[in-house]
């Protein structure tokens, strides 16, 4: 019998994880009454996928943007859900697409995207680190502390586009295709604009380490147009959508009647920050209240591993840049990691200081650094290189991470099925 490749094993495991979680959620949704009946506002018998933000996604994908609070969501995923719903309608030979088609189509795409994202993460990690490190990363990725990979949520397809962009950029050197993937990620989630940092830094530094650059090189950067064009490509979808919201909510008629929304008078008239703060209580330290301490506690494992991983990485980066001074042979990390860790720091800071911090549990799906940190800190004898030096063993941090993701993943499935908080 032929031995299966690691990539094939990851594919099988990813598919089984989707089947298992979907089956569990289906069973739980039949056994548990809804704590919050919001899903019933759309369908009398809502499927287990229709919970929390999926309610908004399905509504906009089916009816379009109707209310101001809905513009907090980028249009990319909603368009994909609508298109997938049309596909379901076509398969069942119906004349009109129904809401349940949109929900089912979105659920299918999200689950397929999660499997694909896992495979791309493996290939990306294999090239940056080594096959063993990549295999461990992928296995941990299949134990997410959230039920959202089984629902029509933004995270699976955002992760696929982000991982694909990083892979195309750092491994295949396809800057245009990478930029398109990153731009696609921005149409899904506004945090996709952070990928412009990765693209711009790669355009500037290439394979050079930031500490190896001569001061004269920085002067040359200002004369280069390519890095800035790359960044514009990635952030363009966000500002294009802001322009769309302006044309809808800031018409001349509304301004003359003094009924235009307050943000219409801003310069520029950007709705995003206003809507996030008014309807979702998102803003600097808005979430820092005593009542939200349990939600901070939920995200603490990821935040802890992120802090420890960031300190370890940048310490390694600085020490490896001083090889000549110390007379050591320490291997510096691949240049692309500097950009990715920088984006990781910005993402974690955003989640900690301005967002609903517990969404870290699902946003982490689109950040490869989270999973690399988990492997680096949770396993002994794993590092950058061709192969591990010695037997790879899980340590106490690894046991804690795996135990936490398994236990909380199970709890999250129950909470999701019954539409219990936290979201």
Curated annotation (Swiss-Prot):
Q: Name one Pfam family in it.
A: Mannosyl_trans2
EC assignment: 2.4.1.-
Q: Which GO terms describe its cellular component?
A: endoplasmic reticulum membrane; mannosyltransferase complex
Q: Name the Gene Ontology biological process terms.
A: GPI anchor biosynthetic process
Q: Signal sequence span per UniProt?
A: none
* The keyword Glycosyltransferase belongs to this UniProt entry's keyword annotation: yes
One Gene Ontology term of the molecular function aspect: glycolipid mannosyltransferase activity
Its recorded name reads: GPI mannosyltransferase 2
Biological or metabolic pathway of the protein: Glycolipid biosynthesis; glycosylphosphatidylinositol-anchor biosynthesis
Instruction: Show the InterPro entries listed in the entry.
Output: PIG-V/Gpi18
């Amino acid at each position: 019998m032929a031995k299966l490749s690691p990539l094939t094993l990851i594919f099988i495991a990813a598919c089984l994880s989707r089947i298992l979680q979907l089956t569990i959620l289906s069973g739980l949704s039949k056994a548990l009454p809804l704590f919050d009946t919001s899903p019933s506002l759309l369908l009398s018998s809502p499927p287990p996928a229709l919970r929390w933000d999926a309610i908004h996604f399905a509504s906009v994908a089916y009816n379009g943007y109707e209310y101001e609070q809905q513009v907090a969501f980028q249009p990319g995923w909603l368009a994909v859900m609508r298109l997938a719903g049309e596909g379901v309608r076509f398969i069942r030979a119906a004349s009109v697409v129904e809401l349940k088609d949109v929900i089912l189509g979105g659920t299918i795409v999200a689950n397929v995207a999660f499997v694909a994202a896992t495979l791309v993460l493996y290939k990306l990690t294999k090239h940056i680190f080594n096959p063993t490190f990549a295999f461990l990363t992928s296995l941990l990725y299949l134990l997410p502390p959230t039920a959202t990979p089984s629902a029509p949520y933004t995270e699976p397809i955002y992760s696929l586009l982000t991982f694909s962009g990083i892979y195309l950029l750092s491994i295949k050197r396809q800057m245009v295709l990478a930029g398109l993937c990153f731009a696609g990620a921005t149409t899904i989630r506004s945090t996709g604009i952070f990928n412009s940092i990765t693209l711009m830094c790669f355009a500037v530094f290439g394979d050079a380490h930031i500490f190896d650059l001569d001061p004269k090189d920085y002067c040359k950067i200002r004369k280069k147009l390519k890095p800035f064009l790359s960044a514009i490509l990635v952030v363009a979808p966000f500002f294009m959508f802001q322009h769309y919201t302006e044309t809808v909510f800031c018409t001349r008629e509304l301004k003359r009647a003094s009924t235009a929304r307050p943000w219409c008078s801003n310069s520029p008239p950007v709705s995003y920050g206003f809507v996030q703060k008014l309807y979702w209580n998102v803003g600097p330290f808005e979430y820092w209240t005593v009542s939200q301490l349990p939600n901070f506690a939920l995200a603490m494992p990821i935040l802890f591993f992120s802090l420890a991983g960031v300190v370890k990485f940048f310490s390694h980066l600085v020490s490896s840049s001083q090889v000549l001074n110390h007379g050591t042979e320490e291997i510096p990390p691949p240049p692309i990691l500097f950009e990715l860790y920088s984006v990781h720091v910005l993402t974690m800071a955003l989640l900690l200081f301005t967002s609903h911090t517990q969404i870290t549990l699902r946003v982490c799906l689109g950040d490869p650094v989270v999973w690399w940190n988990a492997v680096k800190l949770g396993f002994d004898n794993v590092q950058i290189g061709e192969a591990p030096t010695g037997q790879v063993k899980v340590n106490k941090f690894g046991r804690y991470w795996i135990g936490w993701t398994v236990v909380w993943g199970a709890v999250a499935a129950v909470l999701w099925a019954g539409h219990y908080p936290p979201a």
